[in-house]
């Protein structure tokens, strides 16, 4: 397992998860579609559908979020990244064929009380981040993450009259709660995230509200609204540290409305995931075993038409 900690992330700081692998030779991040700006991860010669991409061991970039999900996690939220090459364990999902990428988000109990930054580049990207954490008492703590970015500068360095990078804007809000009782062995996390993302690609001068149903310009617009909730509970037996059990549950609703030229494509993806694990030993700590149960449910509603 390769661990990318906060010090390693500082060497090549990225605005989001898709830009956080610059210093790691095990992973290639490429544009699978230059026109729409879709990024795809490749590991051991296989691409994203064969990778398990999780957030704190809960699958997150899958289904409807496969195309743009890597850009939905801001870089300032990331505490560390764990990379497993090759076929991985099915403990947290069955999709790890080429490998697993797990992202750890900053914890309320250990995060900075206050963090704020602004970013602007000559490529027209502007970004703002706010993070605040509060310890309510010795057991409870909470944190609030707010991220916003804007890309409104048209760039066409190769003079082909098409945008080199998508225009867009994103608002991302995350609220986390943490409960820790070390004496009794209980740890719990709860979170809710709301995200709104808008992207526009196509020819220079394309204005969706004017040119959508005309032949003067070709363009595309992808609007995404997403909600994620999760609950994690763990218990370690105080006198038997090798013995523990954990429960994870997550729900997400991904609504995407898009058009590509005259073709409309809308998708509504609802996903539920649950996981129960029990860890212990046989005889001594050299012989360990894990028992568990995974359940996942996906509901897709897709609409494709010509207008």
Where are these regions (language model features)?
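N-terminal periplasmic "start-of-domain" segments of outer-membrane beta-barrel proteins
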Residues: 1-10, 40, 81
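Extracytoplasmic beta-strand/coil segments of soluble accessory domains associated
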Residues: 18-62, 79
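Transmembrane beta-barrel strands of outer-membrane/channel proteins
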Residues: 116-120, 144-150, 190-196, 247-253, ...
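Flexible loop and strand-edge segments within Gram-negative outer membrane beta-barrel domains
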Residues: 151-172, 180-243, 251-271
């Amino acid at each position: 397992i390769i661990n990318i900690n906060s010090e390693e992330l500082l060497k090549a700081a990225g605005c989001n998860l898709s830009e956080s692998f610059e210093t790691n030779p095990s992973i290639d991040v490429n544009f699978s579609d230059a026109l729409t700006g879709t990024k795809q991860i490749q590991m051991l010669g296989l691409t994203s559908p064969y990778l398990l991409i999780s957030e704190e061991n809960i699958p997150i970039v899958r289904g409807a979020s496969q195309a743009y999900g890597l850009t939905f996690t801001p870089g300032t939220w990331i505490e560390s990244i764990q990379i497993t090459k090759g076929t991985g364990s099915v403990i947290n999902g069955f999709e790890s064929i080429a490998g697993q990428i797990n992202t750890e988000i900053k914890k309320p109990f250990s995060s900075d009380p206050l963090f704020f930054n602004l970013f602007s580049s000559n490529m027209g990207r502007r970004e703002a981040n706010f993070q605040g954490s509060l310890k309510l008492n010795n057991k409870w703590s909470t944190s609030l993450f707010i991220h916003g970015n804007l890309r409104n500068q048209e760039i066409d360095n190769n003079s082909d009259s098409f945008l080199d990078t998508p225009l867009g804007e994103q608002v991302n809000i995350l609220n986390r709660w943490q409960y820790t009782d070390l004496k009794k062995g209980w740890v719990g996390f709860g979170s809710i995230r709301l995200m709104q993302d808008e992207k526009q690609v196509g020819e220079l001068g394309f204005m969706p509200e004017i040119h959508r149903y005309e032949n003067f310009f070709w363009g595309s617009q992808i609007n995404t609204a997403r909600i994620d909730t999760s609950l994690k509970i763990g218990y370690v037996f105080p006198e038997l540290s090798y013995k523990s059990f954990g429960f994870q549950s997550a729900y997400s609703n991904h609504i995407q409305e898009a058009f590509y030229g005259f073709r409309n494509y809308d998708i509504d993806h609802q996903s539920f995931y649950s996981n129960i694990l029990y860890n212990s030993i046989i005889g001594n700590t050299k012989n360990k075993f894990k028992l568990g149960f995974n359940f996942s449910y996906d509901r897709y509603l897709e609409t494709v038409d010509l207008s």
